[in-house]
């Protein structure tokens, strides 16, 4: 454990941030999984609705640095492509 006051404070901040980030990352994964689940069920309307919820979450967390911006772009691109493929079929 840290002995210096500022180091103790930083340790507390790390714990708080870690818990917050873990919860937010879980929320992100859940949102993406809902889109994938709708896609697997060939539910285009449900997938679009779930994607409308997931997209701003991806943008927000990439802006905050919770995930890399390229990872957010990759998720959005792949999910959009799958939604378009289901609508076309």
UniProtKB/Swiss-Prot annotation:
Asked if the record carries the keyword Lipid metabolism, the reply is no
Mention any one GO cellular component term assigned to this protein in its UniProt record. Answer: small ribosomal subunit
Which gene produces this protein?
rpsT
Question: Origin organism of this chain?
Answer: Xanthomonas oryzae pv. oryzae (strain KACC10331 / KXO85)
Q: Which GO terms describe its molecular function?
A: small ribosomal subunit rRNA binding; structural constituent of ribosome
Its function? Binds directly to 16S ribosomal RNA.
Q: What is this protein called?
A: Small ribosomal subunit protein bS20
GO biological process terms, alphabetically, are:
translation
Instruction: Give the highest taxon in the source lineage.
Output: Bacteria
Question: NCBIfam families annotated for this entry?
Answer: S20 (TIGR00029)
């Amino acid at each position: 454990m840290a002995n210096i006051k500022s180091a103790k404070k930083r340790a507390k901040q790390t714990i708080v941030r870690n818990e917050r980030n873990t919860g937010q990352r879980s929320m992100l994964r859940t949102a993406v999984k809902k889109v994938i689940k709708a896609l697997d069920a060939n539910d285009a309307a449900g997938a679009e609705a779930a994607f409308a919820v997931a997209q701003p979450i991806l943008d927000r967390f990439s802006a905050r640095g919770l995930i890399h911006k390229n990872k957010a772009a990759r998720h959005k691109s792949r999910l959009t492509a799958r939604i378009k493929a289901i609508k076309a079929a």
